[in-house]
Structures are given as C-alpha cells and as structure tokens.
Swiss-Prot record:
Pfam families: CHD5
Family: Belongs to the WRB/GET1 family.
GO cellular component: endoplasmic reticulum membrane; GET complex
Segments in the Lumenal topological domain: 1-4, 132-155
Domain of life the protein comes from: Eukaryota
Key words, A-Z: Coiled coil, Endoplasmic reticulum, Membrane, Transmembrane, Transmembrane helix, Transport
Name this protein carries in UniProt: Protein GET1
Provenance organism: Ajellomyces capsulatus (strain G186AR / H82 / ATCC MYA-2454 / RMSCC 2432)
Length: 206
C-alpha cells in the first residue's frame, strides 16, 4: 500500500521534528498564533497587554514624582497604580487559565495526531502488508521477522516499516544537524579569532 507507506514515513518525520524542536516550543508557537485569531482568548490577551503597559507607565510616573514634594500627585498615582495592578493581575490569571486549557488541548491533539495515530495504524493495519518481497529473495527466517507480528509471510509489516522509518529519519536528521554544526563552526572560529586579535592589539597599545 503506497499511501500507507508514505503516511507512516510522514508521521515519523513529524514525530522526529516535534521531538527535536521540543514540544514546549511547538506549543508556544501555536499559542502565539492562536491569540492572533479573532477569539475570546485573543481579546483577553490584548486587554492583558494593554493593562501591563498601563501599570508600567504609572509605575514610571510614580518613580518620576517625589513623594515628599508632590505628595498629593504621588498619592493619586499610587492609587491608580494599585487599582491598575489589581485589574492586571486578575486579567493575567484569566489568561493563564486559558493558556493552561489550551496547552492541555494541544498536548492531547498533538499526541492523537502523531503517536496516537501511529499506534492506531499499526493496530488496524497489522495484517496489511506494506509491500511484498520478491519470492526466494531472502531466507524464510528473515521473512518471518519482516512480517512480524501479523502480516503475511514474504511481506513487510507496518510495525517493521515504522521502525525502519524511525531509524532512518533519526539518522538523516542527526546527519543534517552535524553538517550544519560543521558548516557554522568555521564562522564561529573566525569570530573568536578576530576577538582575540583585537584583544592583543588593545594590550599592545596600552
């Protein structure tokens, strides 16, 4: 089944990318996108940011006002600041609760769309061969392993194919990361070398 073959490979790529980037990073990016949408949560986020700016501004005005020379003005600013801070904390708690609900929903959806879907496919298509091997191409013992646990003899099961995809994706991903690190290393070395030379020249001038 070519479509199943590609689906399993694609799922393994997605799982590797999420694990490499980090689930928390992915959740954070999705949250930033979510609060840009026209929803009630985005309205709460905008109000929270506005209240935060107001609190910071009032605090700055309080710092610029002498509590001794301009006590009446300072006291008025203090009352406004305390009231704004209380409103900000209430709105921030509301946004925090919304984010907790969002994070829980995203975690469930992410697991269902990746690892959960993979488990479902492995169970549902456990008897379905991914592809058939040429007759007599490999010993029957190897054929039995490749068809494990329930695929017909002489075929490759979805479990074996999924494991092979995960291994290859991990190897390719690690190779790409190593290549990027190798390419970027000379630039970093040149920067360090330039900084060292500047330091030596500065000492000579002194």
């Amino acid at each position: 089944m070519p479509s199943l073959l590609i689906t399993v490979l694609f799922l393994n790529v997605i799982i590797y990318v999420v694990n490499t980037v980090g689930a928390a990073t992915v959740d954070g990016l999705l949250w930033l996108l979510y609060i840009q949408l026209p929803t009630g949560t985005s309205q709460i986020a905008r109000e929270q940011r506005h209240m935060k700016r107001e609190v910071v501004q009032l605090k700055h005005e309080m710092s610029s006002t002498s509590s001794q020379d301009e006590f009446a003005k300072w006291a008025k600013l203090r009352r406004r600041h305390d009231k704004a801070l209380e409103a900000y904390e209430a709105k921030n708690n509301e946004l925090t609760q919304s984010k907790s609900t969002f994070d829980m929903t995203i975690k469930i959806a992410r697991w269902a769309a990746t690892s959960g879907l993979m488990l479902f496919l492995q169970f549902w298509y456990s008897k379905t061969p991914i592809f058939t091997l040429p007759p007599g191409w490999i010993p029957w013992q190897v054929q039995w392993v490749l068809s494990f646990p329930r695929a017909p003899m002489g075929t490759v099961s979805i479990q074996i194919w999924g494991g092979a995809c995960a291994t290859v994706v991990a190897l390719v991903g690690d190779a790409m990361k190593a290549s990027l690190a190798y390419v970027s290393k000379p630039k970093i070395d040149r920067i360090k070398l330039g900084a060292t030379m500047e330091g030596k020249e500065g000492k000579k001038r002194q």
